[in-house]
């Protein structure tokens, strides 16, 4: 008997403790966590710096709403924007909220409504974000979606050129479609998007909810492409396990959201900001990012060496890796769990690997050994 809704296919594992990449269940069994709470636990479980930040802030101030000035929000906003061409941040609580804000900002700023998204994308489960998501299974059963969203084939330059015109407010995409199968934007497609934006005055919204904050080895995944965003949405890894989202946007948007035009009660509360600042200070350190890049390259190399290429394809970037299988991967994930490795799917045929950014080579070796045993 349960008092919870049945909207999650929960696994029969009760996790009670975590430290770094290791989590422990109520029976004392340890697992390598290569889910990171779905790309959330950037610095691993119970990172000392995050624990300290949360403890110290919890003894000062928990919540005041956004009716009052916040130097802490100002500092975090500067940390997130200073390495970009963007100027301002707005804080919320989740990726879906950040994407809702991005949609509202683009429509209000341009006075246009049409937003082009892509098939197999995932932008959230609130109604605007769900309408932007290019997956029928996410939208099924909820009636008509919001108007003025069109999902195009991903990486299809011809389809993009046919769809763009002066009525388009924005193009919205993920650099890597994580939920949709770990599909990366191709260089030619990125160039075509930028050309379309320049030619038609279209805004570019990049959803970095899963790829941002060091997940791909750079601060933001778009940095490794030709894409130049006008708007970025963030969440997941930004809080290292504490709920926080953010919208970043350029100088020209400052007056678009005037007082009362958009808001959130909890967004940017002192607890969330203190944790996020700690995460950003760690992850945006060049030495930390270099370490992520090195460990990501090692993980990919080991997977390609140990898994038969005819049966599996390894794709993705940084520590967001997908293993594509010709067979459905549900049984593989279940068997890996039995052997002490937690994984998450990306659709029915892709295993997604999302270890903490602090994962060690020894932990990578252990995970690859389990995967080899399960998949071969």
Question: Which residues does each PLM region occupy?
Answer:
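Conserved N-terminal phosphate-binding loop of PLP-dependent enzymes in the Aspartate aminotransferase
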Residues: 1-376
